[in-house]
């Protein structure tokens, strides 16, 4: 499945947050969206997930898609997993998204079992979600979206509140979902444990001004991309020594990562 954005814009209180955005997202791929705070990253994810109605054209496999159709095909996962906990047990939390679809109990049980296996939560069906670790809560949020048989996941800083081992767990889940044919679109700058991303999109002033591989991204210069983020990518490319030479010669000093 492919989502196509054609001259998509979004205004808030009359001011453009996104303007004339053109992009394509395919299943079986991982897309990382970067840019400074307020550049429109979260707005883009919410438009893709059908949570905001935008100007312009959005297509699913070439056919026009309204927000309702997007919500059926794109699951949105918030930064704070606790904000999505609804049920008193893990299985009830997943079941909630299925009940509103009108599925019978047999089909619900099959889907719950499948998605909990996919995210590594088998055996915790009767647990209180509030007692789960941060990483487990985030996996539960992902499972709840997958239970609806969404083709894409849009995740807004899904690991920013987690410790490194939990970050690794979440990225391993996302990579396995990519291999299952899901499309993954996420905002993050925590890249140490994400080994299988396909594309990086850079947003500046509400417009996507770059979409390409991370090898291509590190060769470009962006005023709002901080040195620690570049360092992570150079390390992934196996070019860290070359990057350090550039860094030392530039006279720059490392600053806090803001992408």
UniProtKB/Swiss-Prot annotation:
Class of this enzyme: translocase
Highest taxon above the source species: Bacteria
Compartments where found: Cell inner membrane
Any one GO MF annotation of this record: riboflavin transmembrane transporter activity
Key words, A-Z: ATP-binding, Cell inner membrane, Cell membrane, Membrane, Nucleotide-binding, Translocase, Transport
Binding site for ATP: 38-43
Domain ABC transporter: start-end pairs: 3-230
Active site as annotated: 157 (proton acceptor)
Membrane association type: Peripheral membrane protein
UniProt KW Transport keyword: yes
Oxidoreductase as UniProt keyword: no
SUPFAM superfamilies: P-loop containing nucleoside triphosphate hydrolases (SSF52540)
SMART domains reported in the protein's UniProt record: AAA
GO cellular component: ATP-binding cassette (ABC) transporter complex; plasma membrane
Assigned EC number: 7.-.-.-
Transmembrane segment boundaries: none
GO biological process: riboflavin transport
Other comment: Structure 4HLU is probably in the open state.
The family this protein is said to belong to: Belongs to the ABC transporter superfamily. Energy-coupling factor EcfA family.
Name listed for the protein in its UniProt record: Energy-coupling factor transporter ATP-binding protein EcfA1
Provenance organism: Thermotoga maritima (strain ATCC 43589 / DSM 3109 / JCM 10099 / NBRC 100826 / MSB8)
